[in-house]
From Swiss-Prot:
Produces ATP from ADP in the presence of a proton gradient across the membrane. The alpha chain is a regulatory subunit. It catalyses: ATP + H2O + 4 H(+)(in) = ADP + phosphate + 5 H(+)(out). The lineage of its organism: Bacteria, Bacillati, Mycoplasmatota, Mollicutes, Acholeplasmatales. This is ATP synthase subunit alpha. The keyword Cell membrane applies. It comes from Acholeplasma laidlawii (strain PG-8A).
């Protein structure tokens, strides 16, 4: 029998002890107490922080939404039907993040950043938290560059600047989304990235939008985040924050971004649903007390950075749906007070055939005027007052009273102004064409024309600025100086195109 070498065994054990590396991980694990309606109540995550990402079985993710004394409330993303009582929940000590980067351009994704368009995986340049603080006051710059929509009534009366937050508000089926989509299409060739956040929209609507943007060559610079009407309230809730994080990535690269939130009424309803399920105290219209903060922290992330910090910008166009034209309701008044102005679409105007149905009296742009071209201010500066006077005179004239010649001229000019401001869907007008049209109106070149001839003249102006030598020269001057320097050239061109109607 071989003799056992005690020393050798002792040395071997000693070496094993020295080579042993303890791989101890300290994890925070909780247990699901109850789960229903995309909400889980979890016991045991005593160190959880608000907004933290947690992991559950079956690759389901969660976001810490409520902190109670003995448990936490978590909103779930993924196959929530597979989660059951007693399942483990692991805290990650990470804030909820989404992929951002150039690879998202031209893609349709869900609010988690997963592709929905069957075009393959997305290679992220970085991962941003969905909740990020708004840029510091000292990092911001002045809003002094215009963001042209191609819609005459907006560019002339309610101009939008890069970095502005302009609310689009009105009843359903009045053209709110159409204005937003036309603005995206008008950014073609202008080096502006567009982010469209669809909240509670039908999937067929988004499919049609993708086709339209492809036809208009606008998809390549657009990111679409779709939280469809059939999705859980949890996805609808995080969708605008995901869009804002994607937009911030491009802004920090020094680029100009346009973001559309369509619409924040449905976002508020989704948040109300989650809050009520979490048994939070409800207030006015059953919304929770922090509903204002929900939207203020989102919209404050838009703005323009100073040149020292890259000079990028995020222009936000949130959309809100009203009921029976009531803009004094809770959510509309909240968002009106947060934004830098609003475009109010009126159902009455829409049914009268005035489209886009923007009520110039109730619409305002608080900061866009500082970004507007000087040429547009020269020709459309008095247009808002003239239009208001026309509306007043028109209502007076309905009584059949005899009008003096001056009032008849004002009435005729007003009707022509309304006709000029009408615009078909996706029929976008560039700035030089708009300026020449308003110059012709203000200086009497349309006084002897009927409405049909005015439509013909507008078409000739747009065509002449691209084909006619005088028109090309005028266009170049307007684009370079952004002001009317040579009135003789302007009037020569208008006289020339008038011959063709």
């Amino acid at each position: 029998m071989a003799k056992i070498d005690i020393d050798q065994i002792g040395a071997l054990i000693q070496k094993q002890i020295e080579d042993y590396k303890a791989d101890v991980r300290l994890e925070s694990i909780g247990k699901v107490l109850s789960v229903a309606d995309g909400i889980a109540t979890v016991y045991g995550l005593s160190q959880a922080i608000l907004g933290e990402l947690v992991e559950l079985p079956h690759d389901v993710k969660g976001l810490v939404f409520n902190l109670e004394q003995f448990h936490v409330g978590i909103i779930l993303f993924g196959r929530t039907d597979l989660i059951k009582e007693g399942d483990n929940v692991r805290a990650t000590k990470k804030i909820f993040e989404v992929p951002v980067g150039e690879d998202l351009l031209g893609r349709v994704v869900d609010p988690l950043g997963n592709p929905l368009d069957l075009k393959g995986t997305i290679n992220a340049d970085a991962y941003y938290p969905i909740e990020r603080p708004a840029k510091d006051l000292m990092h911001r710059g002045f809003i002094n560059e215009p963001l042209h929509t191609g819609i005459k009534v907006i560019d002339a009366l309610v101009p939008i600047g890069k970095g502005q937050r302009e609310l689009i508000i009105g009843d359903r089926q009045t053209g709110k989304s159409t204005i937003a989509i036309d603005t995206i299409i008008n950014q073609r060739g202008k080096n502006v990235i567009c982010v469209y956040v669809a909240i509670g929209q039908k999937d067929s609507t988004i499919a049609n939008l993708v086709k339209l943007l492809q036809i208009k060559d606008a998809l390549d610079y657009t990111v679409i985040i779709n939280a469809g009407a059939s999705k859980e309230a949890t996805l609808l809730y995080i969708a605008p924050y995901t869009g804002s994080s994607i937009a911030e990535y491009f802004m920090e690269q020094g680029k100009d971004v346009l973001i559309i939130y369509d619409d924040l009424s449905k976002h508020a309803v989704a948040y109300r649903e989650l809050s009520l399920l979490m048994k939070r105290p409800s207030g006015r219209e059953a919304y929770p007390g922090d509903i204002f903060y929900l939207h203020s922290r989102l919209l404050e992330r838009a703005g323009k950075l100073s040149k020292e910090h890259g000079g990028g910008s995020i222009t936000a166009l949130p959309i809100v749906e009203t009921q029976a034209g009531d803009i004094s309701a809770y959510i509309p008044t909240n968002i009106i007070s947060i934004t830098d102005g609003q475009l109010y679409l009126e159902q009455k105007l829409f049914y009268q055939g005035v489209r886009p149905a923007i009520n110039a009296g109730l619409s305002v742009s608080r900061v866009g005027g500082s970004a507007q071209w000087k040429a547009m201010k020269q020709v459309a500066g008095t247009l808002r007052i003239s239009l208001a006077n026309f509306r007043e005179l028109e209502s007076f004239a309905q009584f059949g009273s005899d009008l003096d010649p001056s009032s008849k001229r004002r009435l005729d000019r007003g009707r022509k102004t309304v006709e000029i401001l009408k615009q078909d869907v996706h029929e976008l007008i560039d700035m030089p064409s708009q300026i020449v049209t308003f110059y012709a109106l203000e200086n009497g070149f349309m006084d002897d024309l009927n409405l049909k001839q005015i439509r013909s003249l507008m078409a000739e102006i747009e065509q002449g600025l691209s084909l006619n030598e005088t028109g090309k020269k005028l266009r170049k001057e307007l684009v370079e100086h952004k002001a009317i320097k040579d009135k003789a050239l302007m009037e020569l061109f208008i006289d020339h195109v008038r011959r063709f109607i």
